[in-house]
From Swiss-Prot:
Homotetramer. Keywords: Carbohydrate metabolism, Cytoplasm, Lyase, Schiff base. It comes from Homo sapiens. Catalyzes the cleavage of N-acetylneuraminic acid (sialic acid) to form pyruvate and N-acetylmannosamine via a Schiff base intermediate. It prevents sialic acids from being recycled and returning to the cell surface. Involved in the N-glycolylneuraminic acid (Neu5Gc) degradation pathway. Although human is not able to catalyze formation of Neu5Gc due to the inactive CMAHP enzyme, Neu5Gc is present in food and must be degraded. The keyword Cytoplasm applies. The active site is at residues 143, 173. It comes from the Eukaryota. One of its GO terms (cellular component) is cytosol. This is N-acetylneuraminate lyase. One of its GO terms (molecular function) is N-acetylneuraminate lyase activity. Its EC number is 4.1.3.3.
Length: 320
């Protein structure tokens, strides 16, 4: 059985894939990106080539190169590098899984295939099992995101007996708002040392109460420090302070969601906050508008995300 060097927990940044204005991958800034996550945001785990990283818009060759660059630049700086290897083609997923093992990644994750879909738990398990077997020494994580895949198999059902079929299974990236399903995943697997990683950033505090051991998300690229403060407050059982942090984070997310928020806008915000050029997304996504970026910048400033000083006073009205 594959065991991680240590349990994947805490914040995991779903990394963006930087691109040039011509739509080519800009590998030159990934080293700077690593340093920014570690030093400025306090985030030392990453999830590469997922939704935020436009993994399914990249060629297999590009996905391999991106994975290699993150592993290389993250050596001795990052704690864990998880590579998403999901694809519509089983063979491509297996190739990417094997490659992740060869380059020294710390784990692999896979979404359900979403064009010709698996409609039952057993069919999905059979697909995941074949991918996991291509990297038998790596911890395996299932990436549950039914809103995008259209695969509605409940995670609770999937986890029932999963170690019998996939002995390298180590956890779940749960990117759904169904807290009943998530809670039952935790409750029914208390004897296992699974990593339960929540993937809806604006609801993280609720998931922590339900037993989440960590979180994977796009906002941890630029709100990692703030979210870590929420985690610290929660761990210290200062639930009022933790709630204040969550509400403040929600204010920003709620604001940008109303403007239209996705991968393109995440790239624009990350460029704004970090100073590292993330570039445009790849087609069919469109570059975020100047109006969006200006509005997001104004909201960040109004929320005083640089200090959070008023949160300790429980001031939930500031910056609204």
């Amino acid at each position: 059985m594959a065991f991680p060097k240590k349990k994947l927990q805490g914040l995991v940044a779903a990394t963006i894939t930087p691109m040039t204005e011509n739509g080519e991958i800009n590998f030159s800034v990934i080293g700077q990106y690593v340093d920014y996550l570690v030093k400025e945001q306090g985030v030392k785990n990453i999830f590469v080539n997922g939704t935020t990283g436009e993994g399914l818009s990249l060629s297999v060759s590009e996905r391999r190169q991106v994975a290699e660059e993150w592993v290389t630049k993250g050596k001795d700086k990052l704690d864990q590098v998880i590579i998403h290897v999901g694809a519509l083609s089983l063979k491509e997923s297996q190739e990417l899984a094997q490659h992740a093992a060869e380059i020294g990644a710390d784990g692999i994750a896979v979404i359900a295939p979403f064009f010709l879909k698996p409609w039952t738990k057993d069919i999905l398990i059979n697909f995941l099992k074949e991918v996991a077997a291509a990297a038998p020494a790596l911890p395996f994580y299932y990436y549950h995101i039914p809103a995008l895949t259209g695969v509605k198999i409940r995670a609770e059902e999937l986890l029932d007996g999963i170690l019998d079929k996939i002995p390298t299974f180590q956890g779940l990236k749960f990117s759904d708002t169904d807290l009943l399903d998530f809670g039952q995943c935790v409750d029914q697997n208390r004897q296992q040392q699974f990593a339960f990683l929540f993937g809806v950033d604006e609801q993280l505090l609720s998931a922590l109460v339900m037993g989440a051991t960590g979180a994977v998300g796009s906002t941890y690229n630029y709100l990692g420090k703030k979210t870590n403060q929420m985690l610290e407050a929660f761990e210290q059982k200062d639930f009022s302070l933790a709630l204040n942090y969550q509400f403040c984070i929600q204010r920003f997310i709620n604001f940008v969601v109303k403007l239209g928020f996705g991968v393109s806008q995440t790239k624009a915000i990350m460029t704004l906050v970090s100073g590292i050029p993330m570039g445009p997304p790849r087609l069919p996504l469109q570059k975020a508008s100047r109006e969006f970026t200006d509005s997001a910048e104004a909201k960040l400033k109004s929320l005083d995300f640089l200090s959070f000083t008023d949160l300790k006073d429980g001031n939930l009205e500031a910056g609204s």
